[in-house]
């Protein structure tokens, strides 16, 4: 069982037992507080890097520790140590209590009750799932496939990485839960040159599984690693012949899958509980109101099998959930961690996430996507006389308070008379999340989740996430210059 395995590694081997953990929480609850938790973690990470056809770097590191958090009202004290021992646990708890400077009160900790949630991903260690030689063969194979894709490919860089993360959480409300989280990621960057003109293409994928995932067959007939290599080369070559994008206000079609990153940034962050409790989100105090086209239903789903953003439990011990955030255009709920849910008197959603034991949990997304609609993607393209088809994105920025965003594409095309035309580059999409959501007039029936490379940063904390959507049509969106 997961709990027993993790407890053996994180507690028992360090001469800590359940009663020790219970006693620390009991000591903390002698003070006038609302909540406390103890978060144990051990994570192993490796990375292999190929640069210019040579495997130049291999890294391996282990990081482990324990964090103690105490919450009173909207105030939090936190202390952590990279030494998992009973003495360091005592020291961390005393330091956390001294930071908050709370008064004594008689209060008993709830008996620790184990939370056993059915795992939604394997507990295998990806670092040992295949031997080192096979890992290097994957990188060399990527290099060979990309170089052979076209004579204009001049450089191939790739990174193959994985981690094996074990966590155990004990809480003052009596919850004891553990999780084992494998994670793999492959990123490929291809540079092409045609008579002194250079362009780049990026592709990749990942999963909560072992490295053999990259050896699975893609629908194209290639193994996934080869498919990603070809995709990176294809995108780079397309941009070689791409013309400059027009500027103005146009109908815009966003492709399925990774373009959901715009949804993640421009809408998802604005639905996180802390921003709404503080009144800094454009979506604050709008539950029950229409915030998007009635064609839009947006969910945050931590329960998708093997997906990068999925969580059997979040970093507060709450089981991962399927949350409908916006239904038929109506705002239904915010994403919550325990602190913000308590202060807002709302239900937990399984979105309390942290980068590591050395960080505080925050309300964060898992896999955020829009559900499919009734339209065939070809119908959507055919409905536009002149517009933009944005198929892949390279980056962007968003202001949570206003909801305004700026995004740049890595693959885009003109649409003329209902047909996809020439490729265009330096496409910048500018708008406001809440306004753009109301501009959606067609939603495709081709929902796709991204390939598994998403990384989200908030308050300096990086976590893995998933994004997705079907093909969608925006009636009007501003298209400008480069970021």
UniProtKB/Swiss-Prot annotation:
One of its GO terms (molecular function) is metallopeptidase activity. GO terms for biological process: proteolysis. One of its GO terms (cellular component) is cytosol. This is Metalloprotease TldD homolog. It comes from Buchnera aphidicola subsp. Baizongia pistaciae (strain Bp). SUPFAM superfamilies: Putative modulator of DNA gyrase, PmbA/TldD. Signal peptide: none annotated. The gene is tldD. Its EC number is 3.4.-.-. The keyword Protease applies. Keywords: Hydrolase, Metalloprotease, Protease. Belongs to the peptidase U62 family. Probable metalloprotease.
